[in-house]
Amino acid sequence: MRFKRSCSLGVAAAIGMSVLAGAAAAKEMTTGLSFDFNRNDSGFTPIFSDYPNEQGVEEFYELRSGHEEVPIAEAGKGLFLSGNNHSDDLFMGYYKELSGLVPETEYQFNVRFQLATNVENDMIGIGGAPGESVFVKCGVVSEKPENSLDSLSHFRLNIDKGTQSQSGADMIVVGDLAKEEINRPGEYEFNEIETKVIARTDKAGTAYLVIGSDSGFEGITSYYLDDIYVSWANTSEVSVTRGDAVKMLFDHAHRWDEAVGTPTFTDVAWDAPYAEAVAWAEQNGYLGGYGNGFFGPEDMMSVEQAMVMIYRLFGSPKVTDAGVLDSYKDASQISPWARDAVAFSITNKLLVPDGKILPQSPISVKALRYAIGQIGMAD
């Protein structure tokens, strides 16, 4: 049995944007690539980092990579990585150039891959567990991943991957190396991992997919990457689920010292990537459910729902210029409970409609990121 671990939308770029949001509604248009590695490595390049620049260090750290057979029946070949974490912070991974995209454009990348590991969960190791203390990370960046030497003559990446359990601006934690199923103790099994990240292409329309591990376990770690699939869409053309939307607001506005309980909705699993965000929104009254205990985390967030959520974050201030809605022909489509929120959002330029408000339509990633990025600037 294969377990799919899903992660919510990772904001790999700064959430504030200098461009206007444009149309708020999303129109889904995606392009993708898949790699099974049965014939070759498909152009993926291995990279190791966070270790000293010393003679013979690659041998001492036992750094290995290659296009090899995955030790699982009928799995075929995959990308192998192995290293001995003497530095207590060893990063090892692969990156792949994605070319032919629109230059200097923000995309949402959906990434799915399988990781073959033979590490059982709840094991004890030096510095940390060999499973739960080896953090799997994923990101998409506009700069080719490369090493340089820091002041201590250690190899460091030119991208922000974070440190061990912490995500960085360019890579987010999407899992760990512990097996999710223990059908064959000591043998390799697949963990399936899925995530979403947001990144911007460079001037040539190029981005780089990066998948790897950041280790806190001071020992040998070995694993295989296989069946990597990546798709992308312009953030103005992809919609946001209610769960992901709340998580985006939570990541931007939640205070580190603000206690958060657990969600009471029956359709929000306690370990869902957006569970804490939903609980936070619920306990503060920013966004409710549908009734009967349902939140609908996988439903699309509408434009008016998103504006209500942000409006309530501001404390639902009195709206003195509701007439701002009169200039939009589809203003009559706004639900009564959302009219003040939409008016407030337009007045304060949280929402910048392109001729129409489209209140019932799914909000785009770009429009929601723009609105959240304006928090702190509104009156």
Per-range role (PLM):
Residues 86-102, 191-195:
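Short beta-strands within extracellular/lumenal beta-sheet-rich domains
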Residues 152-206:
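Short, surface-exposed tryptophan/glycine-enriched loops
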Residues 63-93:
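Surface-exposed, low-complexity/disordered Ser/Thr/Gly/Pro/Asn-rich loops and linkers
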Residues 178, 210-219:
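Short beta-strand-plus-loop segments that form exposed binding edges in beta-rich domains
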Residues 106-120, 213:
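A short beta-strand element within beta-rich, extracytoplasmic domains
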Residues 187-190, 201-202, 215-232, 361-362:
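Extracellular carbohydrate recognition
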Residues 27-56:
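Extracellular carbohydrate-recognition regions
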Residues 18-25, 234-276, 283-339, 347, ...:
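Feature responds to low-complexity, polar/acidic, surface-exposed segments characteristic
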